[in-house]
Every structure is written in structure tokens, then in C-alpha cells.
Amino acid sequence: MQFGRTYEEFEVGAVYKHWPGKTVTEYDDHLFCLLTMNHHPLHLDAHYAAEATDFGKNVVVGNYIYSLLLGMSVPDVSGQAIANLEVESL
């Protein structure tokens, strides 16, 4: 069984779907905020977020989402890759 793709196996414009998916919960976001000492009320205070955003509720920390996406890509890139040199767009 091969884990990951080599550089030559990636194609420009290809879409790679990663399993398993992840449903982000309020608990996940709050835990990430606490672990990273991000205490901005936009992420933790529902009353503040309801008044300060167009969403009407807390906003998930962008770094958390990026970390999840990067983690989901590990099976495709980490097994054969020597280094991850660049992430151009997500």
C-alpha cells in the first residue's frame, strides 16, 4: 500500500477529495481559542458576535480551518513528499 503521492502524480487543476470529513462544532472552535489564547469575543461571545457580525453568531477562527485543511491533506502529500514548499490557494 502506497501512502501519499509523488510530485509527478499530481496534476494541475486536479481536485483531490480527502476523507474523513470534519464537522466543526462550537466546542471545537472554543477549544482551539483556549489552546491558542485567542480571546477575541468574535469567537467566544455569542452576544458580541450577534451584534458585531452579519452572521449573527460566533465566527470560527480562520487558523483552525486552515489547520484542518492542511491536516486533511496529509494522506496525499506527506507519505511521498520530501517537503511541502507552498500552498497557493485553498
Please provide the spans of the model-predicted regions.
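Hot-dog-fold acyl-thioester-processing enzymes
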Residues: 1-89
